[in-house]
């Protein structure tokens, strides 16, 4: 079901060279993913460049990398993942495993890239589909494309968290750039954090020169989007239907003109840096908190 998969109770894999895999999915059970860990304590470290390509036909649920349970995966070189042909496919997919003894979800941890590297996720469906787990992307360039760029879903009675963190200049190009969700119970959340900290600091005058760009809609009835550190971030597209929390903690964030360009339903907390917008407009559910 998978190109490479770890399923034992304890499995460690270390690859010092390049990892280059290409697969074609011809049926629903042909490939669950190109590379995966689904066990209690599996670890994988790839120090060289990683290139994964999967071609499939709709409606197969194709995945480039998949991780569940207590999986721990690190990719230290350039990372390129392409999953094409499936609207429900994912370049990167994570999910929790329910532990009956603790009555809580066990979530995987994945890191892609390091300083100076490039991370590219390209999918006909989801760039990142995080339904439980911690995902971090680091590099001098991070690009995500798909029908949905980043999907995060946490919470519920299983105490599941779903977090995605970008430590590098990031571009998300997708009709649905960011979608956040929390299951029933809302005990633990879902978050997307832009944390690029450039040296030297780039202080853009216009949104076109921002370090990171989100090109597409931002939606979700819950969840959190964080802007941290000194980098800059620009939103393009409709963000008016995001009803979660946006935390402006550092750097500069640019919004767009018109009602679609504002977090009109969200709760905004500005505790550092600058939030740049032509005007601010809130609906009944909107709220603005300023510090300082």
Regions found by a protein language model. Give the residues of each.
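Cysteine-rich, disulfide-stabilized extracellular repeat modules
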Residues: 48, 61, 88, 106, ...
């Amino acid at each position: 079901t998978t190109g490479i998969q770890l399923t034992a109770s304890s499995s460690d894999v270390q690859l010092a060279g390049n990892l280059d895999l290409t697969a074609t999915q011809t049926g629903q059970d042909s490939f669950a993913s190109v590379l995966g860990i689904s066990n209690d304590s599996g670890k994988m470290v790839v120090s060289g460049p990683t290139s994964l390509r999967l071609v499939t036909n709709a409606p197969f649920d194709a995945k480039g990398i998949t991780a569940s349970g207590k999986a721990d995966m690190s990719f230290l070189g350039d990372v390129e993942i392409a999953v094409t042909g499936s609207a429900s496919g994912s370049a990167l997919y994570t999910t929790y495993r329910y532990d009956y003894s603790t009555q809580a979800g066990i979530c995987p941890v994945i890191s892609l890239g390091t300083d100076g590297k490039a991370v590219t996720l390209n999918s006909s469906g989801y760039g990142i589909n995080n339904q439980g787990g911690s995902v971090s992307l680091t590099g001098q360039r991070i690009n995500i494309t798909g029908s949905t760029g980043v999907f995060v879903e946490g919470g519920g009675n299983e105490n599941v968290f779903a977090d995605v963190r970008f430590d590098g200049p990031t571009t998300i190009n997708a009709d649905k750039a960011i979608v956040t969700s929390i299951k029933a119970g809302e005990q633990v959340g879902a978050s997307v954090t832009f944390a690029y900290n450039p040296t030297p600091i780039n202080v853009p005058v216009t949104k076109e020169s921002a370090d990171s760009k989100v090109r597409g809609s931002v939606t979700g009835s819950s969840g959190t989007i964080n802007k941290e550190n000194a980098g800059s971030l620009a939103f393009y597209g409709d963000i008016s239907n995001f009803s979660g929390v946006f935390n402006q903690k550092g750097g500069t964030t640019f919004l767009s003109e018109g009602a679609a360009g504002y977090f009109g339903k969200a709760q905004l907390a500005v505790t550092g840096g600058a939030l740049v917008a032509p005007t601010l407009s809130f609906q009944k559910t909107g709220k603005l908190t300023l510090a300082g």
